[in-house]
Amino acid sequence: MITKRIIPCLDVRDGRVVKGVNFADLHDVSSPVELAEYYSRAGADELVFYDITASAEGRALFTDILTETARRVFIPLTVGGGINSLADFDRVLKCGADKVSVNSGAIRRPALVGEAARRYGDQCVVLSVDVKRVGGAFRVFARGGRDDTGLEAIEWIRRCVGEGAGEVVVNSIDTDGVKRGFDLEMLDAVCRAVSVPVIASGGAGCIDDFLTLFRAQPRVDAGLAASIFHFGEVRIDDLKDAMARAGIPVRIVAAAQAERSETCSTSTN
């Protein structure tokens, strides 16, 4: 049985991890390299790095941070932000990324998805979609959630998967940072439309939100979150223990268990 993945998301601006609500009101959190190392030890299955202002500012994605992170962690890295060409794919992959996430770049030039899939393989191409309800419809937003593209989200996702995207990260702007649970209705629509792995993003506030996600939408492959992990509201090992007890298939990392045991031992001495 395929295990469900737990993926911390590191939104990076000016070399620091930040987090806000509804894609706005951003606050400084930590060093991305140090935070990535922590999550690697804590049992995260993968990491997602987004340079959240690269597209809006029309500049290249951070590569120095990525290179240093790839040297220190040994779990898969997905990296996005400012990906507009095959040259951007090349640069990010050479710096140590395992997968490349494309969002606004695909909206500007949809052929990029197919070109990248043919060159690197569809397993390397992750479609990231920022979705918000507008007039009852799911609409695609670009430039870090700033611009309404007018694209209908489910059709856009179906189109890009048809071009070769091997995985989809669905970012709910409506629930981002709100901590009231994932957007199950939207995720259901996406899972019905495509057969590639779907990663749910936006809305996690507690362990029960992940349990509800995987029970209600068993076709969702992974849950992605930021602030609840960054601020210690949910520990990844505690989350995975709860998932295992609930019968949800999950990878338990021995290193994370050992670190927790050592912490507990220290606290009782």
Language-model segments: residues:
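Structural preference for beta-strand elements that scaffold enzyme active sites
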Residues: 5-9, 46, 74-78, 99-101, ...
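Conserved, mostly hydrophobic/aromatic
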Residues: 11, 39, 47, 79, ...
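Conserved anion-binding
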Residues: 12-14, 18-19, 97-175
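Glycine-rich, proline-tolerant flexible connector loops at the mouths of alpha/beta enzymes
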Residues: 46-64, 104, 169-181
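Glycine/small-residue-rich loop that forms an oxyanion/phosphate-binding "nest" at active or ligand-binding sites
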Residues: 53, 61-122
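Charged helix-capping and loop-helix junction motifs
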Residues: 60-67, 110, 150-154, 180-189
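Catalytic cores of alpha/beta
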Residues: 73, 77-99, 185-222
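C-terminal helical cap(s) of enzyme catalytic domains, especially alpha/beta-barrels
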Residues: 113-120, 214-254
